[in-house]
Amino acid sequence: MSSTSLYAAIDLGSNSFHMLVVREVAGSIQTLSRIKRKVRLAAGLNSDNTLSAEAMERGWQCLRLFAERLQDIPPTQIRVVATATLRLAVNAGEFLAKAQEILGTPVQVISGEEEARLIYQGVAHTTGGADQRLVVDIGGASTELVTGTGAQTTSLFSLSMGCVTWLERYFADRSLTKENFDLAEAAAREVLLPVADVLRYHGWKVCVGASGTVQALQEIMMAQGMDERITLAKLQQLKQRAIQCGRLEELEIEGLTLERALVFPSGLAILIAIFSELNIQCMTLAGGALREGLVYGMLHLSVEQDIRSRTLRNIQRRFMIDTEQAQRVGGLASHLLSQLDGSWELDPLSRDLLLSACALHEIGLSVDFKRAPQHAAYLVNNLDLPGFTPAQKKLIATLLLNQTNAIDLSSLHQQNAVPPRVAEHLCRLLRLAILFASRRRDDLLPAIQLTAQDEQLTLILPGNWLDEHPLGREMVDQECQWQSYVHWILRVASGDTLK
């Protein structure tokens, strides 16, 4: 691979230093390496905003690691930015001079507004869902809040509060008491007060979080089998659990890594304040943030309206999926679904995820026909799919695992993107669409009617279709059997005959 196709973005944050190395592939980016080190620079700021020698040394030590990787990348394709702590530090010049010497490239201290803009761009390029969004990023020493539509921001704010500074200020004794949480939340709400009205005025349809705190919450919820949406009720539950633990060094929550535990309570307090003050109903994890914003900025790639569609097209191209067949199966699945509108109510996101599964259902063939569903599930689980959250990826993989033959009901119940019953409905529709499109010709698709009464499905096929298609009849009989094994009732009507 030529080094000229490589790009690097480095973010000198207040809690961690990050480096992202990518290459451009089909209008998107392919991640080649990510390096992250907890430097906790903000913890080295004293009351006069002077950065301690120890904190600076921790930072320089990390940059020596990064410098080795940067030697392979053209300087014009590297961007290094520093955020809140180095905006505040009165002796930032000393740190930056040596940082530039180590890296061999300029380090730009960006304003809070510029940081917010870049975070939003990173989210816009990598996160699916509704166009009108609120983006929240809780850093080590600042918190960015941005509203926008598509690629355009409508308001951006960078506030002086972060998980490291709040840790030092409100949890300095490492005690996880209700009093400490109350103080931290009240202080965060005070910081939010001047900007809350403007953010609410611009409004949003979806809220996404793009920080380590939100990543930690996602990991906790996945580990505990909850759905991936972050709500105030879940945040309050986690706060109670932290208070029960009593002390920071004794904080144990299933799914919370040791690395994230130190700044988790302070980040949690800030997030609870944001949810309460802005009346946020739910939040999901963003696909990217500041570093992705830097990289996409260097590549001058425009923001696509539908990131999920771009991702699916790229995957289809890469794995040489038959797109006509994928569309055929998707069209039939949509047709079947539209007939069940009154009985099986599926929300727009569930419909989208069903069509995404249709688009990728033959990806397993790129490995081998034998065990193709298992190959498909493995690939989808392990591919980078911009626009899809981890839980959505898991659902699509689970649907593909169950697209034919025996049904693994437990896998449908273990995913946490949609309720188990919805996953079952999506699976049944996908299987029927694949079965009836198996001849791979539009003119051979039968005119199917589908009705549902609770969990019982009735398929009504035209006239003599079953008599004229002996293989089709066999496949339908087999499908009825597969579904009956997991207590799904599928009845088939042809004319006046009901099976």
Swiss-Prot record:
InterPro entries: ATPase_NBD (IPR043129), GppA/Ppx_hydrolase (IPR050273), Guo-5TP_3DP_PyrP (IPR023709), Ppx_GppA_C (IPR048950), Ppx_GppA_N (IPR003695), PyroPPase_GppA_Ppx (IPR030673). CDD domains: ASKHA_NBD_EcGppA-like. Keywords: Hydrolase. It comes from the Bacteria. Its EC number is 3.6.1.40. One of its GO terms (biological process) is guanosine tetraphosphate biosynthetic process. One of its GO terms (molecular function) is guanosine-5'-triphosphate,3'-diphosphate diphosphatase activity. It catalyses: guanosine 3'-diphosphate 5'-triphosphate + H2O = guanosine 3',5'-bis(diphosphate) + phosphate + H(+). Gene3D superfamilies: 3.30.420.40, Exopolyphosphatase. Domain 2, Hypothetical protein af1432. Pfam families: Ppx-GppA (PF02541), Ppx-GppA_III (PF21447). Pathway: Purine metabolism; ppGpp biosynthesis; ppGpp from GTP: step 2/2. Catalyzes the conversion of pppGpp to ppGpp. Guanosine pentaphosphate (pppGpp) is a cytoplasmic signaling molecule which together with ppGpp controls the 'stringent response', an adaptive process that allows bacteria to respond to amino acid starvation, resulting in the coordinated regulation of numerous cellular activities. HAMAP family: GppA (MF_01550). Belongs to the GppA/Ppx family. GppA subfamily. This is Guanosine-5'-triphosphate,3'-diphosphate pyrophosphatase. It comes from Klebsiella pneumoniae subsp. pneumoniae (strain ATCC 700721 / MGH 78578).
